[in-house]
């Protein structure tokens, strides 16, 4: 009998869970972003403008779902220059996605963190009066308090671009109760960073902090569309498997781990059968099985051939595993980590 880690029914929906529009420091309007991403096969777009949640229900149609969300920044405010391109110290960024479509109340509101066009939307900000002018301080205690408040406020919390942020192990390993982290971030990659965060993900998992992994563009679209090497859309994404394209079905699928992160490769099925972890995928050069064990496992192709299926026998002491696909073109797909014995 098969035990599916990613549900076997429903449809996969392509999602960008990190996106900036003219509401903050992006160049494209929310409507322009919808048109662009729909053209490229996306069904879900989280409008994660900086430090302000502005919903876009008018953009909803049968083939496109906007998610209510924002990117919350934590840094040492008195070191912040307030201007794009300037340096500031000690940042941590969190993506907050409202689980329910009618949730527009931000947590940990602080108007001093608004910049670029976001300052023009302050009058539309919705938040609990008890959290007005929340004192954001770059400490693990404060960041954990924000995460907990976000959960109580009905948000799915993603740890964004740890490589871009320059956060180090002794700090980020103290973060607790994250729902997911960005294993890839395309804007950071386009800037020149190696924002493939396998190591950070494993750090959390090995420390007992279980979470999913996602990927997003973090697009700002300041360069000519598609032709410029720094164009930062449609590079990394999250595939979400859900029964239908409805708001709560999509956020519930994220919560349940019915998703994978990619920059080109695909995972079609992931399940356990006869004591083995089995995965079917797009044409791959290599499929690897990573766990809490000292030794990973891998299946490789011979020259001129490709893999579309792999299976692995877990070690008896494996507590969790994750799968990584390396396509013949060098593109990746990352499964979430899943517990083996539950």
Task: Show which residues each predicted segment covers.
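Alpha-helix termination/capping residues and helix-transition junctions
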Residues: 39, 175, 207-208
